[in-house]
């Protein structure tokens, strides 16, 4: 019973569970229905998404359909769509464009001939100054006296002596030395004149004013000032102007007037100023204005050649000068016009290569990097590099056969010297091992680094085929010819390149290579090379034209180069990508481009101005070095002179030039002769050093030293000071002798015997290497009393108003008390200003006009570019 009951209960439970499950299902269905009805009736928006599994299946279906459509598209692609793919690939492989350094170009173009600056005043070292007069008791009188003093009386701080002061003065004279003086331009009205007369310059007028207003001026002098005026001799085109000058200043200005650099200007001079090749070029039509006045003048530019030979052992300097020339040349090379449409050309190349659909063939690389910007960039780079003699380096991918075939044209047209050897060897080796040797079934060339022969030279000996060997021989011997034209060394291209005949030689070699069997290479390889050669050979006519165009533009611009074209490998190189050479070969059209006359004249003017400035700065530096040697400035740092020389050339970053090149440059400058005018000016200064020293407030003619205190003496110009005006009664020793021998025993003995010693020779008042410091360092025990146990540097024998123990500069007011000192400055009296001795008449031309830009008189035009002819009297571009 129990068992049965248990079983019955189990069955009952199962039945109950089933019923419960059914009820739950019914409830769930009802709920679902309720939710659906609610969703339908509700205004809320809900996003219903599929389950993840369904999404995955849908994605797979989409992927499969996409793949199928892709395959269909690849098969059915039109040439236009294919072209777009190629274009996209080109965009991915961008060619770096040249970014000109605007600052360098501006520096070059801003160099103007300094001769053109107008002089507004005469050159002066001295000026008259009023100084008070002191009575015997030290009181200042109301009267004044006029003395000649230096205008710029500045001694720089530091280790500096009087001879160096004179060297600086000489440098200042060279900087201010005018190349011409036209007194009419600087003349000003004399305010005190009776009949509105003029004096030579504003400084003369101001001196006249000051003297006229001075109460102590004599009546005769005032009357003379009232009569001062210019005297004109119109028949001789001459004018005389009154001037007030120190005799030394008069000597300077008279010399400048007699040695002016201006020369008469006429049409023949302008005609001969234009480079001869441009004058004789039938493509340029030049006309000149015939209305030049008889008073026209010009300053002949200084275009001496090769005095420093910067190309020889001056790597940094040569690199800088060629870089600036390269940037200038690029700015004047004309832009190519009417290039073949990139899209059309790539489409045509695709047809020639039979690239109807994208394949994984090496030919697809042939089309990469082709664009008009790269073609124009390549054209400018080649011409500018040859003009400036900048070394180029080649960038290429060995697997891009089209680049290498274009490189064969490049090596045919551009001489080997223009490429850095490592880059040239790599390119030649790639051409030999990729194209030439495989064509004849020869083994790869294993080139040893450092081999004196280049790969093409080795290949020339091993290739039996005449046409290929003949082309290799031409490339191996492709060098610039050095020709002197108008006194300038020019690097001229081979005649076969100038007339374009060499391209036929190249094509013969290429056709021979394309006919070979490539026995050791697969068929695809042979076909790729042949198709690449076909692409280039299809443009035979355009390549001949391109070569002629390149040579013509190079030679026309070369006519405007005024400095010798020395070829030496440069430290840095200009990069040239072979893909851009391919662009140039494939896109060159039939439009001729030649430099405009305005561009040529601009290029010529910039070259002339730089060259002339370069020579003038050399003359200055040589003169300063000679002056330093004549002044016995053994300790003068010559490097500073060379640095100044380079700074004045504007284009050099002087701080980065290595020291060894600085000293080599100094040695070269030392060997050059001094220009006559600069030598004469130095001799004028040397003859008058004593007068200049006297006029300075900071240069003394000696110093007196003693153990015992010396009384201050009355001086008419300064009152009671430690200044001695004569050396009567003093033992004298020459400072130059003392410094040269270094023997101080004589001074020591005198001082021990209480005898004052006068050291005679020019010395600055304030200097860290003064004579007293020098002597005191020799024997501190003997000279302890002189330096009074103070720092040597603080002992400055300058015009003490009280005594050397005081830093204050009070005038002496207590006449009963006489202060003393242990040092005296020996100073000679400066030259007194005497109006009659300072009045000079200066003579110059009444009037003339200096023209700096001679080419402004020339109006120029060109023939229609399509009719432009090359040196052989045939059109530059024949393929129309």
Curated annotation (Swiss-Prot):
Modifications made to the protein after synthesis: Sumoylated with SUMO1 and SUMO2. Sumoylation of viral proteins seems to have a positive role on viral replication.
Write out the GO cellular component annotations.
T=2 icosahedral viral capsid; viral inner capsid; viral nucleocapsid
In chain numbering, the residues marked as site (Interaction with the intermediate capsid protein VP6) are 220, 224, 228, 839, 841
Q: Where is the composition biased (Basic and acidic residues)?
A: 19-30
Location of the protein in the cell: Virion
Annotated signal peptide: none
Q: Which GO terms describe its molecular function?
A: RNA binding
Residue ranges, annotated region (5-fold hub): 1-80
Q: Which InterPro entries match?
A: Rotavirus_VP2 (IPR007779)
Please tell me where this protein is predominantly located: virion
Give the superkingdom in one word.
Answer: Viruses
Q: Where is this region: Hydrophobic?
A: 394-414, 422-442
Question: Which key words are in the record?
Answer: Capsid protein, Inner capsid protein, Repeat, RNA-binding, T=2 icosahedral capsid protein, Ubl conjugation, Virion
Extract the ranges annotated as region (Disordered). Answer: 1-43
Extract the Pfam families matched here.
Rota_VP2
Quote the entry's note on domains: The N-terminus binds RNA. It is necessary for encapsidation of VP1 and VP3. The N-termini of 10 VP2 molecules form a cylindrical hub underneath each 5-fold axis of the inner capsid.
Family, according to the entry, reads as follows: Belongs to the rotavirus VP2 family.
Subunit structure of this entry?
A: Homodecamer; each decamer is made up of two conformers of VP2, called VP2A and VP2B. Interacts with a VP1-VP3 complex. Interacts with the intermediate capsid protein VP6. Interacts with NSP5. Interacts (via N-terminus) with NSP2.
Role this protein plays:
Inner capsid protein that self-assembles to form an icosahedral capsid with a T=2 symmetry, which consists of 120 copies of VP2, with channels at each of its five-fold vertices. This capsid constitutes the innermost concentric layer of the viral mature particle. It encapsidates the polymerase VP1, the capping enzyme VP3 and the genomic dsRNA, thereby defining the core.
User: What name does the UniProt record give this protein?
Assistant: Inner capsid protein VP2
Q: Could you tell me which species this protein originates from?
A: Rotavirus A (strain RVA/Cow/France/RF/1975/G6P6[1])
């Amino acid at each position: 019973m129990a068992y049965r009951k248990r079983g019955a209960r189990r069955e009952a439970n199962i039945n109950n569970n089933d019923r419960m499950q059914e009820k739950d299902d019914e409830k769930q269905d009802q709920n679902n229905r309720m939710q659906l009805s609610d969703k339908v009736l509700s205004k809320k928006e809900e996003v219903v998404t599929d389950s993840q599994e369904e999404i995955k299946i849908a994605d797979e279906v989409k992927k499969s359909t996409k793949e199928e459509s892709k395959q269909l598209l690849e098969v059915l692609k039109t040439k236009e769509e294919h072209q777009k793919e190629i274009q996209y690939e080109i965009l991915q492989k961008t060619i770096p464009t040249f970014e000109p350094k605007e600052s360098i170009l501006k520096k070059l173009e801003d160099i103007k001939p300094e001769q053109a600056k107008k002089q507004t005043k005469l050159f002066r070292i001295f000026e008259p100054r009023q100084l008070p007069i002191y009575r015997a008791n030290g009181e200042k009188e109301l009267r004044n006296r006029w003395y000649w003093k230096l205008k710029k009386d500045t001694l720089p701080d530091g280790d500096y002596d009087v001879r160096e002061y004179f060297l600086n003065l000489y440098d200042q004279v060279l900087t201010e030395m005018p190349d011409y003086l036209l007194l009419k331009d600087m003349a000003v009205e004399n305010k005190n004149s009776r009949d509105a007369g003029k004096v030579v310059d504003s400084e003369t007028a101001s001196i006249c004013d000051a003297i006229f207003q001075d109460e102590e001026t004599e009546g005769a002098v005032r009357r003379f000032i009232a009569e001062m005026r210019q005297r004109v001799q119109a028949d001789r085109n001459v004018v005389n102007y009154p001037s007030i000058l120190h005799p030394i200043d008069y000597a300077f200005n008279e010399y400048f007037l007699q040695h002016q650099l201006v020369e008469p200007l006429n049409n023949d001079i302008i005609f001969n100023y234009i480079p001869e090749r441009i004058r004789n070029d039938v493509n340029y039509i030049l006309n000149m204005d015939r209305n030049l006045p008889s008073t026209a003048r010009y300053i002949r530019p200084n275009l001496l050649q090769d005095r420093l030979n910067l190309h020889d052992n001056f790597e940094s300097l040569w690199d800088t000068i060629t870089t600036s020339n390269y940037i200038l040349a690029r700015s004047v090379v004309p832009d190519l016009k009417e290039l073949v449409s990139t899209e059309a050309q790539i489409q045509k190349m695709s047809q020639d290569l039979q690239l109807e659909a994208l394949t994984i063939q090496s030919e697809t690389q042939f089309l990469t990097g082709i664009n008009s910007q790269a073609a124009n960039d390549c054209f400018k780079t080649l011409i500018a590099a040859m003009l400036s003699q900048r070394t180029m380096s080649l960038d290429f991918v060995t697997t891009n056969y089209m680049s290498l075939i274009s490189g064969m044209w490049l090596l045919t047209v551009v001489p080997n010297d223009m490429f850095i050897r490592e880059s040239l060897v790599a390119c030649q080796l790639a051409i030999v091992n990729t194209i030439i040797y495989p064509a004849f079934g020869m083994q790869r060339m294993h080139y040893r680094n450092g081999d004196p022969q280049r790969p093409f030279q080795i290949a020339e000996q091993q290739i039996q085929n005449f046409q290929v060997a003949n082309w290799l021989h031409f490339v191996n011997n492709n060098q610039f010819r050095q020709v002197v034209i108008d006194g300038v060394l020019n690097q001229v291209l081979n005649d076969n390149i100038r007339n374009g005949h060499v391209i036929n030689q190249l094509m013969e070699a290429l056709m021979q290579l394309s006919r070979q069997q490539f026995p050791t290479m697969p068929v695809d390889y042979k076909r790729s090379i042949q198709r690449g050669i076909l692409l280039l050979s299809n443009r035979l006519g355009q390549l001949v034209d391109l070569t002629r165009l390149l040579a013509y533009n190079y030679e026309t611009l070369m006519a405007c180069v005024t400095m010798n074209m020395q070829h030496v490998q440069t430290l840095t190189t200009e990069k040239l990508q072979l893909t851009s050479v391919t662009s140039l070969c494939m896109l060159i059209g039939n439009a001729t481009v030649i430099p405009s006359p305005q561009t040529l004249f601009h290029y010529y003017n910039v070259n002339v101005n730089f060259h002339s400035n370069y020579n003038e700065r050399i003359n200055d530096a040589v003169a300063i070095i000679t002056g330093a040697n004549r002044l016995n400035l053994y300790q003068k740092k010559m490097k500073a002179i060379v640095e100044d020389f380079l700074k004045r050339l504007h284009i050099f970053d002087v701080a980065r030039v290595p020291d060894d090149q600085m000293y080599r440059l100094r040695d070269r400058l030392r060997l050059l002769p001094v220009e006559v005018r600069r030598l004469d000016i130095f001799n004028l200064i040397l003859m008058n050093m004593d007068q200049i020293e006297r006029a300075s407030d900071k240069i003394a003619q000696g110093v007196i030293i003693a153990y015992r205190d010396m009384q201050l003496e009355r001086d008419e110009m300064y009152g009671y000071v430690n200044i001695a005006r004569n050396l009567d009664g003093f033992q004298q020793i020459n400072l130059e002798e003392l410094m040269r021998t270094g023997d101080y025993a004589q001074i020591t003995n005198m001082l021990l015997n209480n005898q004052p010693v006068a050291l005679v020779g020019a010395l600055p008042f304030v200097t860290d290497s003064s004579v007293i410091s020098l002597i005191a360092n020799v024997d501190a025990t003997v000279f302890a009393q002189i330096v009074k146990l103070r720092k040597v540097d603080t002992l400055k024998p300058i015009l003490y108003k009280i005594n050397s123990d005081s830093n204050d500069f009070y005038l002496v007011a207590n006449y009963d008390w006489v202060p003393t000192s242990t040092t005296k400055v020996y100073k000679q009296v400066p030259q007194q200003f005497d109006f009659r001795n300072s009045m000079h008449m200066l003579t110059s031309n009444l009037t003339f006009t200096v023209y700096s830009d001679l080419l402004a008189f020339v109006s120029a035009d060109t023939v229609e570019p399509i009719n432009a002819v090359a040196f052989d009297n045939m059109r530059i571009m024949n393929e129309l």
